[in-house]
A protein has these predicted regions:
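A short, flexible loop at the N-terminus of ABC-type nucleotide-binding domains that lies
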Residues: 1-6, 11-22, 71-72
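ABC ATPase nucleotide-binding domain
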Residues: 5, 26, 62, 337-339
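Pre-Walker A (P-loop) beta-loop-beta motif of ABC nucleotide-binding domains
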Residues: 23-34
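Helix-to-loop junction immediately C-terminal to a conserved catalytic motif
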Residues: 51
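Conserved ABC transporter NBD signature motif
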Residues: 59-67
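ABC ATPase nucleotide-binding domains
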Residues: 71-230
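Non-catalytic connector elements of ABC transporters
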Residues: 238, 250-357
Length: 357
C-alpha cells in the first residue's frame, strides 16, 4: 500500500471563489483521516481533487512516490464511496459488485473470488439476486462500500456515505465502516459534516473552514485542545461555552466574578473564555473558582440535564453559562453556584481567535 500526500493544494473557480486554500496533508497506510467541516468549507472539493474528478489549480497529490496530480481518475487505483451510493438500478447486487472489475477487464475467476470475499465480509451473500430498489438504505450502503472494497485499491475515499441514513441505522453502519476499513491496510479519506462520525471513526481529523485546515490532530486532541475559536465552537455537542469577557490585572471578569488567568506573556483588555458544559459542575465547598447565577432554561437529555444559567452580573446583559448536570434534581429557576475548574478552561484571543498564549 502507499502513503497519500497533498502538498499545498489549491482550487480556484474564480477570483472570488476559492474553496480550497493551500491544504497540505499526509495519510499513512491504515490511517483513517476525516475531513470535517460545515457546508462550503472545501472538504468535498478536496476529496474530488484527490479522486481526479476535479482539476487541481495549484499544488501536488502523491500516492506513494507517484505524482498523480493530473492523472486520469480511472488510472489512480483509488476507490470511492459516494453519498448517493451510485448503484446501477438495473443490476443485481452481484452485478453491481462486479461491474468495476469487469470494466477493468479483470479475469472472471478473480472477479468471482473478490466478489465472494467482500460479500462474506459485508453479509451480502443472501442479497446477490436483488436489485437496489429491493434493498434498505443500510443494505444499499453496504453494497456501495463493497463495490469499493472489491477494487483492492491503494486508497479509499468516502464522501458523506452515511448522510442519507436515519440516526439508528447510521450508528450501526458507522460501526461496520470502522471495522471494515481498519482491516484494509490502506489510506482512507472520509468527508463529513457530522462530528460524531469524525470523532468515532478517525485516527486523524482535519477540521476545515473557508478552505483552510484549522487543525489537524487525533480526535481526542481536537476535542480537548482546540487550536482556535472555530474548532472549539464547531466540535462538541452541546457546544462549548464561549464568552468574551474583560480582563483586570491577572484575572478575567465573568459577570461579577473573578476568574484567574494563566501567566500570559501579555495582558489583553478582553479575552474569550471557553469551557465545555460537561466541565461546568455544581460547586463544592472546597472549590475556589466559582460563579453564581439563576437557572432560566432546563433541557432534559436523558442521562443529563442541560442547564442554562444567567450569571449574576451588574452588566445590562448578564453572561450565560450552560452546564450538563445530573438529571435527578429539579433545576428550574434555581439559584445555583457553579465551579469552573482551571484545568478545563480554554483561553482564546479576541482578535485572531487562536489559543491565547
Amino acid at each position: 500500500m502507499a502513503i497519500l500526500q497533498l502538498k499545498n493544494l489549491n482550487k480556484t473557480f474564480s477570483p472570488k471563489v476559492i474553496p480550497v486554500k493551500d491544504i497540505s496533508l499526509s495519510v499513512e497506510d491504515s490511517e483513517f483521516l476525516t475531513l470535517l467541516g460545515p457546508s462550503g468549507c472545501g472538504k468535498s472539493t478536496t476529496l474530488r481533487m484527490i479522486a481526479g474528478l476535479e482539476e487541481v489549480t495549484r499544488g501536488k497529490i502523491f500516492l506513494g512516490t507517484e505524482d498523480i496530480t493530473y492523472k486520469r481518475a480511472g488510472d489512480r487505483n483509488m476507490a470511492m464511496v459516494f453519498q448517493s451510493y451510485a448503484l446501477y438500478p438495473h443490476m443485481t447486487v452481484r452485478e453491481n459488485l462486479a461491474s468495476g472489475l469487469k470494466l477493468k477487464k479483470v479475469p472472471s475467476g478473480e472477479i468471482q473470488t473478490r466478489v465472494t470475499e467482500v460479500a462474506e465480509l459485508l453479509g451480502l451473500e443472501d442479497l446477490f439476486q436483488r436489485k437496489p430498489g429491493q434493498l434498505s438504505g443500510g443494505q444499499r450502503q453496504r453494497v456501495a462500500v463493497g463495490r469499493a472494497l472489491v477494487r483492492k485499491a491503494e486508497a479509499y475515499l468516502l464522501d458523506e456515505p452515511l448522510s442519507n441514513l436515519d440516526a439508528l441505522l447510521r450508528e450501526r453502519v458507522r460501526a461496520d465502516i470502522k471495522q471494515i476499513f481498519a482491516a484494509q491496510k490502506a489510506p482512507v479519506v472520509y468527508v463529513t459534516h457530522d462530528q460524531t462520525e469524525a470523532m468515532t471513526l478517525s485516527s486523524q481529523v482535519a477540521v476545515l473552514n473557508n478552505g483552510y485546515v484549522q487543525q489537524l490532530a487525533p480526535p481526542a486532541d481536537i476535542y480537548n485542545h482546540p487550536a482556535n475559536l472555530f474548532v472549539a465552537g464547531f466540535v462538541g455537542s452541546p457546544q462549548m461555552n464561549l464568552l468574551t469577557i474583560p480582563c483586570k490585572g491577572n484575572s478575567a471578569m465573568l459577570g461579577d466574578f473573578s476568574i484567574t488567568l494563566p501567566k500570559f506573556s501579555s495582558s489583553p483588555p478582553q479575552i474569550v473564555l471557553g469551557i465545555r458544559p460537561e466541565h461546568v459542575r455544581v460547586a463544592l465547598p472546597e472549590d475556589t473558582q466559582t460563579v453564581k447565577g439563576r437557572v432560566y432554561l432546563v433541557e432534559n437529555l436523558g442521562m443529563y440535564k442541560l442547564v442554562s444559567v444567567r450569571v449574576a452580573s451588574s452588566q445590562t446583559e448578564p453572561p450565560t453559562l450552560r452546564a450538563l448536570l445530573p438529571p435527578d434534581q429539579n433545576w428550574d429557576n434555581e439559584e445555583i453556584t457553579l465551579a469552573l475548574p482551571s484545568e478545563n478552561i480554554h483561553w482564546f484571543d479576541v482578535e485572531s481567535g487562536d489559543v491565547f498564549q
